[in-house]
Amino acid sequence: MKSRPLHIAMYPWLAMGHQIAFLHLCNKLAIRGHKISFITPPKAQAKLEPFNLHPNSITFVTINVPHVEGLPPDAQTTADVTYPLQPQIMTAMDLTKDDIETLLTGLKPDLVFYDFTHWMPALAKRLGIKAVHYCTASSVMIGYTLTPARFHQGTDLMESDLMEPPEGYPDSSIKLQTHEARVFAAKRKDTFGSNVLFYDRQFIALNEADLLAYRTCREIEGPYMDYIGKQFNKPVVATGPVILDPPTLDLEEKFSTWLGGFEPGSVVYCCFGSECTLRPNQFLELVLGLELTGMPFLAAVKAPLGFETVESAMPEGFQERVKGRGFVYGGWVQQQLILAHPSVGCFITHCGSGSLSEALVNKCQLVLLPNVGDQILNARMMGTNLEVGVEVEKGDEDGMYTKESVCKAVSIVMDCENETSKRVRANHARIRELLLNKDLESSYVDSFCMRLQEIVEGI
């Protein structure tokens, strides 16, 4: 089969973690001669532009996000709202459907990549475009919660069902705690935009795709991808690790200067992504746990629920006690550059797939502190299956962590003489070496491009 340059449209979920993940894949596709039309709102585009390494091949196409009642006037992505308002962002994204159809009709791409827009496959089929579901969540998560073995539209998922993996699942050691299963079961009844149930939206998006793609490699998630392929009776491909190219900007001076004042590998960096808003009590336990380590730390976290700023949420006397060694910041940060800074030795992560991809190719040790959704099963895979990090202990019933449990996990991974730390460091180093193998990455992307050609040609 003779290959030709493809025209690919991208319309990811309006969360920066998803947007950046899609754009990193675009960079890999652009190197191989493919043309990309990346559909995104203006505020997201401004943040994405430094990550566009091939502007001659990757074009941003602006989409206006309609206002939905309950959202701030200028809300365009999940970074602009608290977690409870994310369904309204989804509703706003659904309301762009007609505009997307108009854009795709004019652009005439060969394929469209999507994730949360369950209506995309039907729209694409009507226009003669192939639909690729590009999943930034791990196949571990999708296999556990959304395959036909687990999921039936219109039926409830009970808490007891979710405590154990579904029949045929590749790893019986990956399980949910009581409080996690309770939340997953309750979410089965939750709508997520436009009065569509969250699980229905995700299941339809998967079930109606022409191709299912995962940002991973088979060396790490192969059995889970095979399981999903059998369950949905669809082709499932890995794009490879998609190692992030460095952004074109330098680290902001306030962070580079601050980090530069500490010894190599000594700083604990904590970040929970653009979507996570902690409850006040968990925010307090987190920052007090960081203080308790006695180590220098940089925490990039949003203000907790009910607070306008992180400064107003600080415990009394905290800022004075950690002055000179503690930096709590409430805005968006250049995480990729921070993780690569030589002073950073530990990363407390919420276990979002994007953050884990960035972390695994750096040398910082991982402390796993998942919050919601796929983060939980990502943490199990990283902590239990791959053993590349230590998960913060939480109460089985209430899911609460304490300052002591935060401090304990950090202390374990930062102690070079601890047996758990030795094992985690060795496993992390092995996977890092695997992921940084440029031949591995290149072969995956080449194979992925070939599969896209086959889908377009109907092979």
UniProtKB/Swiss-Prot annotation:
Catalytic reactions on record: a flavonol 3-O-beta-D-glucoside + UDP-alpha-D-glucose = a flavonol 3-O-beta-D-glucosyl-(1->2)-beta-D-glucoside + UDP + H(+)
Residues engaged in binding an anthocyanidin: H18, G373
Enzyme class: transferase
Matching Gene3D superfamilies: Glycogen Phosphorylase B
Keyword Glycosyltransferase: yes
Domain of life: Eukaryota
GO molecular function: flavonol-3-O-glucoside glucosyltransferase activity; UDP-glucosyltransferase activity
Binding-site residues, UDP-alpha-D-glucose: T136, V333, Q335, H350, S355, E358, D374, Q375
Expressing tissues: Expressed in leaves.
EC numbers: 2.4.1.239
Transferase recorded as keyword: yes
Key words, A-Z: Glycosyltransferase, Transferase
Active site (catalytic residues): H18, D115
Protein family membership: Belongs to the UDP-glycosyltransferase family.
Role of this protein: Flavonol 3-O-glucoside/galactoside (1->2) glucosyltransferase converting kaempferol 3-O-glucoside to kaempferol 3-O-sophoroside. Has a broad in vitro activity for kaempferol/quercetin 3-O-glucoside/galactoside derivatives, but cannot glucosylate kaempferol 3-O-rhamnosyl-(1->4)-[rhamnosyl-(1->6)- glucoside] and 3-O-rhamnosyl-(1->4)-[glucosyl-(1->6)-glucoside]. Has a higher preference for UDP-glucose than UDP-galactose, and no activity with UDP-arabinose and UDP-glucuronic acid. Represents probably a dominant allele of the gene.
Note: Flavonol glycosides (FGs) with glucose at the 2''-position of glucose or galactose at the 3-position of kaempferol are present in cv. Nezumisaya and absent in cv. Harosoy, whereas FGs with glucose at the 6''-position of glucose or galactose at the 3''-position of kaempferol are present in cv. Harosoy and absent in cv. Nezumisaya.
Protein name: UDP-glycosyltransferase 79B30
Protein species of origin: Glycine max
